[in-house]
Amino acid sequence: MKKSLKLAAAATILATPAIADTIPVPYNTLNTNMENPLYMPGARVFYSKLSNGLMLKVADDSEAHKDKHHDGSTEFPIIRIQEEMGYGITDRLAAHFSVQYTHDDDIQRTGLSAGRLGLTYRLLNLYNGFVWDIYGDLHLGGIGEMRGQYNIAGDAATAQATLTQLTPAIMAGQMTKEQAAQMALGASLLDAHGVIDYDNYSNGMWGFHVGTKVGKVWDKLTTSAFVEVLRTFGDDNSRIRIAGSNAPILPGYSTALVLASMGAPSEVAAEFKSVTEVNAGLNAFYQWTSKWSTGAWFRYEHHADQGIEKITTDVAPELEMVKKALEDKLSDMNDGFDAYIIGLSAAHQFTDHAQVAVYGEYTFDNAHERSQNGTDAKVEAGVRVNFKF
């Protein structure tokens, strides 16, 4: 009897590794390779992913680019640096933070271009390799102001047409040429047009992202898909300089001169409308060896048209009609765009705690007429350095 018990105990001990071997290897590696799209840090593990990229863009022929005489222009190098870090609170719950900085010297635009802080929860992590995550992030666009310069020009055709209409009154002595000119100039400002030169990449608004990700692991192959929604909260966290054109509206009168004579402010704040945006994507990842891995992805981004709810800066009474006309004109800025991004990466695991990846992306886009984000070509390449401890 004692011999039988000993044999049973020995059999149990020998069988234990076999039971462990029935757990698929990928189930145990989702917290190992930081380039895996389903990566999540284990409990009490901190990770950092620092991406350093260079981008080249060729501007399309949108109305906004034409107004800036920038259509067809090449922007290079555009410096893009992104830091993503996270911490495993438990094996299923992780906190994460990311921030991106972009510098484009060709258009004198620089600053934080993305930022988010949030939590990811792993709802499912099955032994067959199926994974389901949900996450929610605070959108950090409200950290800084939206800054730029609105280059405004009165409509010369409107001024000339108004002056022509008033010519009989001038001939009849009902008004002077100077009075008629002032009316014509005022009418030209009501039909004014312009374009914003952005100083930075912030939209000046807080918001939140909510999203979900599902994936499956087959031995060395991982695939995943995600979809997320961003909702921003409109506010007037903006500072926009007003620059009148020096081109003549009427002989001897320019937009800059007319605005100065009317006491126009040098800068204004505007309350931008809340918007809803959508991102979605697919990822594939292959673990060739314990050291080498590659990834590929497709991502879709829908960026909504921006719009101004109202200009919150007080202006002189004679400028109220101009202010209202600008609010109406900019209520729908028609500057949205859709981006379709494909990317590839290759990574090498140097140690259990350090990894380096190279990556490249190409973007196709479909931009609205007043968008400054439309391109004929957009490509980015860079190096990402990953650590965990």
Q: What are the functions of these language-model segments?
A:
Residues 87, 91, 121-123, 138, ...:
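Residue-level signature of outer-membrane beta-barrel architecture
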